[in-house]
Amino acid sequence: MLDKDEDAEYERSVEMFRLKKLIHKLDNLKGSGTSMISLIINYKDQINPFMKMLVDEVGKASNIKSRVTRQNVTDALTSTMEKLKLYNKTPNNGLIIYCGLASEGDSGEKMFKIDMEPFKPINTSLYRCDSVFHTEEVKKLLEDNDRFGFLIMDGNGSLFGSVQGATRTVIQKFLVDLPKKHGRGGQSSNRFARIRTERRHNYLRKVAETMTAVFITNDRPNVKGLILAGSADFKTDLNKSDLFDPRLSPLVIKIVDIAYGGENGFNQAIELSSDALRNVKFVHEKKIVGRFFDEISKDTGRFVFGLKDTMEGLEYGAVEVLMIFENLEHNRLSLKDNNNTVTFKIFPKKETPSGNKFRDENGVEYEIIDNTPLSEWFLDNYKKFGTHLEIITDKSSEGNQFVKGFGGIGGILRYKMEQTHGDVETEDAFNEDDFI
């Protein structure tokens, strides 16, 4: 069973991947005239003013001299209004609509009608009627939004800060006056050492308590990871101390030595921990792929890889976590024969039939009624199989091994099942109808 945090992580990665695929598609669409509508509504804005604006735009479009352009613009505006009418109010995260006549590659023009609520709030409202769809503001939703906590600690005081994307924030800081080491011997030296130890302990306690106050919200960490930095042993002592909140200690991703305290030290700590911060982006991926590899190394039978076995596992409802490479190079074709019977086949991208006809190895001819990238089909259908979808990159060592060694598709099973470990790439095509 997955806990609430893991569930949220899966959903977030899926929605980011879905948006990334949509942006890629939109960026490859081109119109023959300025009839492609891009409409973005800020989550704080109301729908009515935009509906009124579109009605006004329809009136203005009647003045366009070219009959073809006038009709295309009017159709795009009408389609946009139809999409807008589906919403009584602006969704919690805002609304994104793209409508217009456009062509993709060498294919002919067709009307595209897309509406969606983004997976996180969009802060900009925008309207454009152009020969391209405008995705600049939508791309900002894909920017890194993870927040990392920083502690800069030395014998003079501590600074607590955070880094989120390109934003660096000082949250809190305080100074401390600790006794220096005592050079003389005798009883006074022993007493001074006790005082110094006590002051140091109190300082660690204050830092630990402030860490909890700053980096815990509603009993949960509010940062993705923590960097402990300083010019002495304080940072290491804190990390080993029982005073350090057990909810925060697992989040420490790096301990760095710096030459300065305060804000200069904060800047240096950010610079020295940049590699660690980049790696944290792949912690979730490393964890899930690592779990997949563990199942294989222990020979539990609770794993599957290769397209054929993975699809079979999905049909049986056995796949707990479906893992696919973000650039999975397969297409899913919907085929109709002369009896109007629809079947499905999956092809490697390079072997996907072109045109609108396909003849199989038995000489049976089919009409190709749909050609969808397999990754997009998984995005739309994975929940029907009762599975969680994990998008794997080849940026981490674990992800790279999964892509190169296991074909970029596999899963973790709920229970053991018999498999052949076959792969689509050894066949002409995989007939999904055997399983779906």
Swiss-Prot record:
It is found in: Cytoplasm. Its main location: cytoplasm. SUPFAM superfamilies: L30e-like, N-terminal domain of eukaryotic peptide chain release factor subunit 1, ERF1, Translational machinery components. The keyword Secreted does not apply. It comes from the Eukaryota. The keyword NADP does not apply. Keywords: Cytoplasm, Protein biosynthesis. GO terms for molecular function: translation release factor activity. One of its GO terms (cellular component) is cytoplasm. Heterodimer of two subunits, one of which binds GTP. Directs the termination of nascent peptide synthesis (translation) in response to the termination codons UAA and possibly also UAG and UGA. Belongs to the eukaryotic release factor 1 family. This is Eukaryotic peptide chain release factor subunit 1. It comes from Dileptus margaritifer (Ciliate). The lineage of its organism: Eukaryota, Sar, Alveolata, Ciliophora, Intramacronucleata. The gene is eRF1.
